[in-house]
Amino acid sequence: LRTMRAYGPVDKVGMVYNELEANSRLTVQRMQALGGVEGFATEAFPMPLDDAGAPDLAALPEQVRLAKAGGADWLYIPPDSFLNVNRDILTTAARDAGLPTFASAENFIRASHGLVGLVSRYYNVGQYVGYLAEQILVGGRSPGELPIRNLDRFSLIVNMTTAHDLGFYPPLSMLSIAEFV
């Protein structure tokens, strides 16, 4: 939230997500709670399901347009496997709608058209998972006895091509701390 607010006032955050993924539902709920505490509105746009009960990919650009039309200042992209696989469609729709994106995973910024994200680098996640695997395979520990914890190192990544396309450049305060791609 501080990162988004560094760009300017945040009145409303839109969120497109796949409600079939528990992590996405929980993240959307947390953002809604944060909005209540921090004084910004949120609007969630769950992906419609097709006849097979899967997210309807064809509806993805429209969900983004609805977020923009509903007055969102930002589109928050939660951790979501469906959105990650379809990140180009999602981030292109947001860019084309003039809606800046804040992503929770680096692929949306590095490998697509997302604007900015405060992310746990995949490299760091891999190191931690390797440590856990060692504890299980070499140390003989049960997976259930290992603590679940969040990583405490994050990277601020800004996609400058997207910033240029949107005409929405990072504030000077980010120049010394962000990684620009």
For each feature predicted by the language model, list its residue ranges:
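Short hydrophobic alpha-helices and adjacent helix-cap/hinge residues
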Residues: 1-181
